[in-house]
Design a protein with these regions (language model features):
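Extreme N-terminal, non-catalytic leader segments
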Residues: 1-61
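Walker A/P-loop phosphate-binding motif and the immediately C-terminal alpha-helix
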Residues: 42-46, 56-97, 102-105, 119, ...
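Phosphate-binding loop that captures ATP/GTP phosphates
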Residues: 85-141
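Conserved nucleotide-binding/hydrolysis micro-motifs of P-loop NTPases
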Residues: 96-99, 148-151, 199-200, 232-236, ...
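Phosphate-binding/switch loop-helix module in NTP-utilizing enzymes
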Residues: 135-138, 142-184
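Conserved catalytic-core segment of NTP-binding enzymes
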Residues: 162, 172-252
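Beta-strand-loop-alpha "switch" segments that mediate conformational coupling across diverse proteins
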Residues: 231-278, 282
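NTP-binding/hydrolysis catalytic cores, primarily Walker-type P-loop NTPases
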Residues: 266-313
Length: 313
């Protein structure tokens, strides 16, 4: 992270989607329009969203619109928030190796990696066996480390096997994906969270990311995306508003995360929710609540089952 800017805003903000995405779901619309900051009623609604049951499993891919956007820490805090408030088992996969990698931001309980999990997937018959490959944070979030070179060592079949294996034990899977593997993991995404920095680069980065998604057949996934502007301060408000102007009407919701120096890499592996400032925690609660609101959309892999159940009634 760059040096902290002065005077961060005191509260997070949730921006509503464009008119074309405001159909149905009155509760979700109110949720997105709510602004955090001492509003216990809004916080309660976020928590209620997180606790709503849903059918099957959900896969959330977290993507950075540009380098240094805060993709990894956003995925980590989103995972912590789900684990703390949802009550369902949550796992995050580190597929974005480097000095600031997901696994480096959490305490390590195992030397196993995603590669090892895939190699021995047929031997994982219980949650106890599964836990040999994960490290668990205090929030309850489990993290699978990337290994030395997952970008070249794993192919499409490997990722498919990993997802199938995790679906047996976890209700929510988050994938922190490097740019080199985005094309391999997006086919498994039920939702995407797009992260842009609160900087002058953000408007162009958001526009290019949307264009890439549309150009590669992910327009529908893009319309249901949640776009996060990360590291917001008063100094960056002009850049933030320009980025939001690009995204508004083209994604489901926009969420601002305020600057918080507790998220810096030199605080790792103590990047836990309790270490954050209250407005930052509230912003991540809002983000998780908005993402959870998208769980009402039944993934295509379950739609045939649902239709059969409805036909048998």
């Amino acid at each position: 992270m760059p040096p902290p800017p002065p005077a961060p805003p005191s509260e997070p903000a949730i921006t509503p989607p464009g008119p074309e995405h405001q159909h149905g779901g009155g509760g979700l619309r109110r949720l997105i329009q709510a602004v955090g900051g001492g509003h216990s009623e809004a916080d309660a609604e976020y928590q209620q969203r997180l606790q709503q049951p849903f059918q099957g499993t959900r896969h959330i891919v977290v993507l950075g619109c540009t380098g240094g956007a805060g993709q990894t820490v956003t995925g980590l805090m989103l995972g912590h928030t789900f684990a703390q408030h949802n009550g369902e088992p949550v796992v995050a996969i580190d597929i974005n190796p480097g000095p600031g990698a997901l696994a480096r931001r959490t305490r390590s309980e195992t030397n196993e990696t995603l590669t090892g999990l895939i190699t021995r997937a047929d031997q994982i018959g219980s949650l106890t066996a599964m836990r040999r490959y994960t490290s668990q944070a205090k929030s309850g979030l489990e993290v699978i480390a990337a290994g030395k070179n997952p970008l070249q060592a794993l192919d499409d079949r490997d990722y498919a096997l990993a997802i199938r294996t995790l679906d047996r034990f976890y209700s929510i899977t988050l994938l922190d994906a490097a740019a080199a593997v985005v094309a391999r993991v997006l086919p498994y995404a039920d939702q995407i969270v797009l992260v842009a920095p609160a900087s002058a680069d953000a408007p162009r980065a958001v526009a290019m990311t949307f264009e890439w998604l549309d150009g590669h057949g992910y327009e529908e996934l893009r319309t249901r995306a949640v776009t996060v502007i990360n590291g917001v301060s008063r100094r960056s408000m002009d850049d933030v508003e320009q980025a939001e102007a690009v995204a508004r009407g083209r994604c489901r919701a926009l969420v601002r995360i305020p600057w918080d120096d507790h998220l810096s890499m030199d605080r790792a592996p103590r990047n836990e929710l309790k270490s954050l400032r209250a407005p930052t925690r509230r912003a991540y609660l809002a983000l998780a609540g908005v993402v959870a609101g998208g769980f009402t959309v039944i993934p295509e892999r379950y739609q045939d089952v649902q239709q059969e159940q409805e036909a048998s009634r």
